[in-house]
Amino acid sequence: MTEELLKAESCFVLRAEDRADMFAQVYKKLLEQRLVAAGFLDQVVDREEDFPTGLASCNLAPGLPNLAFPHTEGCFVKQQRVVPIKLLAPVSFKSMVDPSRELPVGFCFMLLDQKADGQAELLARTMTFLSQAEPAALSRIFAQTDPAGLYSALREEGF
């Protein structure tokens, strides 16, 4: 990833009651950083309900947390960014493969892009990183418990 897509101030470690609470906490921080527009929260919640982004991590390596890649329409985004979110306790996301299945997700990569097809590009780049990283490196990244450590671990692995 390029330096512009990953910023220390946009790496979060948080505890959320549920998916809606996680979205609300992250939205507040992104709004303060002027990365998203008003309306982003409702849109990301609605889009996640209609087009789930949860993904079981079993194909990457055993023992890794399930992942999610929430995003929304570009008109609600002010600046391109990949926002890593470590969840201290898993929250439930619907599976993108089987939306009838709920997954306990422990880590999210929120994708912010103003372009209509930008999220697909960011998703592809993020998935390439995840599929090429060593399982031990991913374990180290996903084990971080503070934002600075999360940012450092991602940068050290070339994200």
Where are these predicted regions, by residue range?
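Cytosolic covalent-transfer regions centered on His/Cys nucleophiles
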Residues: 1-159
